[in-house]
Amino acid sequence: MSTAPQQAEQHHRIDYIELPAKDIAEVKRFYGAVFGWRFEDYGPNYTSFMDGRLNGGFDKEREVSKGGALLVLYSKDLDATLAKVREAGGRIVMDTFSFPGGKRFHFTDPAGNELAVWTEP
């Protein structure tokens, strides 16, 4: 069976995302508790994550930098997700606000990476 249609679907699509994390165990705990992500370790300095749609990894050797790309996650229940982020030790850096098409908030994870979560109105 040919994989050409599958490869065509994925051509030029974002395929993998890497984020810095000095404490791999802590980011695994945080993202597992808040978003239900699964992980696979590749030695002591790297773990990959699977969110059910997009894969990525956390790299202990990279430094957090400000002003990079903003990763935006989707939630069916924004308030519940915000509460889980707080409970798991994330820091809300921009409270929920409305924008054309929905609402979102921004947070930093235990490694200091800034992400956002959005929902439809």
Predicted regions span which residues?
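N-terminal beta-strand motif that seeds the catalytic metal site of vicinal oxygen chelate
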Residues: 1-26, 69-71, 120-121
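Residue-level hotspots at or immediately adjacent to binding/recognition sites across diverse folds
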Residues: 3, 57-59, 68, 75-78, ...
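Core segments of cupin and vicinal oxygen chelate
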Residues: 11-56, 103
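A short linear hydrophobic-aromatic micro-motif
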Residues: 38, 57-58, 91-95
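Active-site beta-strand termini and strand-to-loop segments that position acidic
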Residues: 49-52, 107-110, 120
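Short, charged/polar, Gly/Pro-enriched secondary-structure boundary elements
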Residues: 54-57, 112-114
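Short beta->alpha transition motifs characteristic of CBS
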Residues: 59-60, 117-121
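Vicinal oxygen chelate
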Residues: 72-114
